[in-house]
Structures are given as structure tokens and as C-alpha cells.
Amino acid sequence: MNVGPRVLIVDDHPSFRASARVLLESEGFDVVGEAEDGASAIAEASRLQPEIVLLDVQLPDTDGFDVAAQITAATGHVPAVILVSSRDSSDFGPLVSRCGAMGFVPKAELSGERLQELLA
């Protein structure tokens, strides 16, 4: 049983959710749930109370920047939101910090070490 930080993975691509789960669990994180869109992300974050929300920037019903702000407002606690995208962080400029996210990681560079660096 994992005892690391509790993580909610939010992405509309099942293959990314599955690979992120395997990667994070192998590095000691406790993946407590998954969501495929903004509405379910907000509901799951409220229900599961994760310490970290790994949140895709592009979701089918909204964008990750809006979801990040809503999760903080809706859950009553402040999980560390880490945005991910297949695009480079330079595409998003100051939007990452404005939405309350702890940081950004390109999907190709996702690792437990990168998450720990952002959380430090």
C-alpha cells in the first residue's frame, strides 16, 4: 500500500491517465482517483481531498486554468495543483501562476522527481 502524497489525475486521455498512474505509483505516490473532464475533476477533488491534483490544461468541457481555480474554491482545502500539457509552458505564460497552480510539467517530462521539485 502506498503512503506517499494522495494524487488525483485529471486528463481526457485514458492512456495518459493509465501511464501517469503507473509512473507515480512506482515512485511512491498514492493515486486515489482519476477524472476525465473539469466537472468530474471538481467533484472528485471535493470527495477525495487529494494533496495533489495533476491537471491537464486542455479538457473537453473547460480548461485546466479554470478548473484549478474552481477546485480550490469548491473543496474547502487547497490541494497542490500541477498543470500538465503536451505543449510547452511558454505557451501559457503567467496563466499557470494566476490560476493558483503550483507549477507546470510537460507531459513528456512527468516524473515523481519533477512533482517533488514543484512541491518543495
Regions found by a protein language model. Give the residues of each.
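Non-catalytic signal-transmission and effector/linker regions of two-component phosphorelay proteins
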Residues: 1-6, 112-120
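Active-site residues of response regulator receiver
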Residues: 11, 56, 85
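Two-component/phosphorelay signaling modules centered on CheY-like receiver
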Residues: 14-33
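Acidic catalytic/metal-coordinating carboxylates
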Residues: 37-40, 63-66
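The feature encodes the CheY-like receiver
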Residues: 60
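Short amphipathic alpha-helix used as the core "switch/output" element in two-component signaling
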Residues: 65-77
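Alpha4 helix (beta4-alpha4-beta5 surface) of REC/receiver domains from two-component response regulators
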Residues: 66, 87-105, 109, 113, ...
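A short, hydrophobic beta-strand element within the central beta-sheet of small alpha/beta folds
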Residues: 78-90
